Amino acid sequence: TYASAQHIVRNSYYSAYGMTTDFTGVLGAQYIYHFDKCLFMPADLTGGIEFNHDNLHDKATDVQKYRDAALAEDPTATGDRLQQLIEKYTPAPLNQVVNIASVYAQNEWKNEQWSFLIGGRVDKNSIMDKAVFSPRANIRYNPTQDVNIRFSYAEGFRAPQAFDEDLHISNVGGELVSIVRAEGLKEERSRSFNASVDWYHYFGDFQANLLVE
């Protein structure tokens, strides 16, 4: 089992970053079991569960910057008109709470010449309607002690959520940008294929390596 937590409070750098608080916590458990023989060769079975919590709040605080922008649009603005323009240029506060529950498992068969890995992970993000399944597979073959041939496939995803690092990049450059997560966004998906041949060889005290990928 494992657990970690982090709480960030940011209110610095000449008000460019506004006021940001971000609490993240992780709680999980992992189990590993070794088979002397599973079907056709030794294997390691790994399984686990994990829960991630992220609570992000962000509020712009540089009122003078937004007042200057308002007066640049209408130098004669006063009273309610000026306040309306200031509100127009002030980025909307961001309040985002994300909970992610995950379960994963993989089994790796291996000996000195071969290894076969197959596994998968299911993640349920609270800002998404459905859980996402991400599979992975890997095959390794060593025809000789110096040569390693590997083929792998993996899938991944990224949920449509805002991150602390994205909030104030434009503001630091002088642009007034409000980050808002649009409704109905779907997750980004990735599929990765990889094939490689890795060669190692010792020449006395020196080691040579050639990788084709």
Question: Which residues does each predicted region cover?
Answer:
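Face-selective signature of the C-terminal outer-membrane beta-barrel domain
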Residues: 1-129, 211-213
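Membrane-embedded beta-barrel scaffold of Gram-negative outer-membrane proteins
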Residues: 1-11, 142, 150, 184-213
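Residue-level preference for beta-strand/loop junctions
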Residues: 21-23, 41, 97-99, 131, ...
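Outer-membrane beta-barrel architecture
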Residues: 28-32, 102-108, 136-138, 152, ...
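Outer-membrane beta-barrel strand-turn architecture
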Residues: 33-39, 109-113, 133, 141-145, ...
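Membrane-spanning beta-strand positions in outer-membrane beta-barrel proteins
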Residues: 40-46, 115-117, 138, 142, ...
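Short, glycine/charged-enriched secondary-structure capping and boundary segments
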Residues: 61-63, 132-133, 164-167
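Surface-exposed extracellular loop regions of Gram-negative outer-membrane beta-barrel proteins
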Residues: 126, 146-193
